[in-house]
Swiss-Prot record:
It holds the Pfam family RL10P_insert. Gene3D superfamilies: 3.30.70.1730, 3.90.105.20, 6.10.140.760. Keywords: Ribonucleoprotein, Ribosomal protein, RNA-binding, rRNA-binding. Forms part of the ribosomal stalk, playing a central role in the interaction of the ribosome with GTP-bound translation factors. InterPro entries: Ribosomal_protein_uL10, Ribosomal_uL10, Ribosomal_uL10-like_insert, Ribosomal_uL10-like_insert_sf, Ribosomal_uL10-like_sf, Ribosomal_uL10_arc. SUPFAM superfamilies: Ribosomal protein L10-like. This is Large ribosomal subunit protein uL10. One of its GO terms (cellular component) is cytosolic large ribosomal subunit.
């Protein structure tokens, strides 16, 4: 029996690099000091945009750093914080992490407004209306004139350069930029595109919740409309239950008066406030009765005259007469009104 001897190799795991240990501890410290971790997506984000962003927000956001995703996961784990599943799923690719105690919604709004102009590339989608302004382009006449013609931009040659005759819209929001248009815009020095930092979301430690970008960046106009609608609904509810606050009581009193007036008119209760409505109601009922009787009304000698529309008062004398008649009407007593109604309906 032969003995077979072999070499047994043992695997020695390389020691965790010192710089990684230091960075994980740094992230742990920032997690301890701050309530919010904002995550920005750096995939396909130009370096000059990141540089300008850092420069603009350096004082406001002292700690913003590109960190490997696994090191952030490690820092959460060692801090005893369970990373939400939604956040873990977003930690792919290159990301910038911002640690802060600022309101995440306000911060996201500020970041969403930060942008940098950029030239249009073929295949880009126009974000807004693109206008080529009238004036001297500084370009010399040549084959480029055919490009202007293809894009329906009217031109003329003056002093050896191409002049655009009038402001021309060359693209509307949603239009795809053609190679010809992209080339021309670059030659004219027009940078119609806007580059922005892409927000993935924010982790709020006090809530142990991940807030995605679509919930983080608020549409202020939409929220304003919702608040206005909520206020209107609350006011309507307050009026319906007569809630005793100044804003509601003004409307509640007016509503109570209208409701009381309606009930009084329905009940035929005669007062100076209900008299005009009662007369109108009685007159309408009389017209309806005559209409229902048809020819029989004439046989019975019942006629109701439809009052003619008052003629416009052209002279001062007519105005005075009208005022006098109005005063006479006001002097009619409640007894006379009651008698008139009684006579009308028998």
């Amino acid at each position: 029996m032969s003995a077979i001897t072999g070499r047994v190799s043992t695997y020695h795991r390389e020691k965790f690099p010192e710089w990684k240990v230091k960075l994980v501890n740094e992230v742990k410290e920032k997690l301890k000091e701050n309530d919010v971790v904002l995550v920005l997506d750096l995939v396909e984000t130009p370096a000059n945009l990141v540089h300008k962003f850092r420069k603009k927000f350096r004082k406001e956001l002292p700690y913003m750093k590109v960190i490997k995703n696994n090191l952030v996961r490690k820092a959460f784990e060692q801090s005893g914080i369970e990373m939400p599943k939604e956040m873990d799923e977003q930690l792919v690719g290159s990301n910038m992490f911002i640690f802060t105690n600022d309101n995440p919604f306000k911060l996201a709004l500020k970041i969403s407004k930060f942008s940098m102009p950029a030239p249009a590339k073929p295949g880009d989608v126009a974000q807004s209306e693109i206008v080529v302004p009238a004036g001297d382009t500084g370009l010399t006449p040549g084959p480029i004139l055919s490009t202007f013609g293809k894009l329906k931009i009217k031109t003329m040659v003056k002093g050896g350069t191409i002049h655009i005759a009038k402001d021309t819209v060359v693209a509307k929001p949603g239009d795809v930029i053609s190679p010809e248009l992209a080339s021309l815009l670059q030659k004219l020095g027009i940078t119609p595109m806007e580059l922005k930092m892409k927000i993935k979301g924010a982790y709020i430690k006090s809530l142990n919740r991940w807030v995605p970008a679509e919930e983080l960046v608020l549409d202020l106009n939409k929220y304003k409309e919702q608040i206005q609608e909520a206020y209107t609904n609350a006011l309507a509810l307050g009026v319906s239950i007569a809630y005793p606050v100044p804003e509601v009581l003004k409307l509640s009193v007016a509503k109570a008066f209208q409701d009381a007036l309606k009930v009084a008119v329905e009940a035929g209760w005669l007062t100076k406030e209900t008299a005009p409505y009662l007369l109108s109601k009685a007159y309408a009922q009389a017209l309806a009765l005559v209409g229902a009787l048809g020819d029989k009304a004439k046989e019975l000698g019942i006629e109701v005259e439809v009052p003619a529309a008052p003629a416009p008062e052209a002279k001062e004398e007519k105005k005075e007469e009208a005022e006098e008649e109005e005063e006479e009407k006001k002097e009619v007593s409640e007894e006379d009104l009651s008698a008139g109604l009684g006579a009308l309906f028998g």
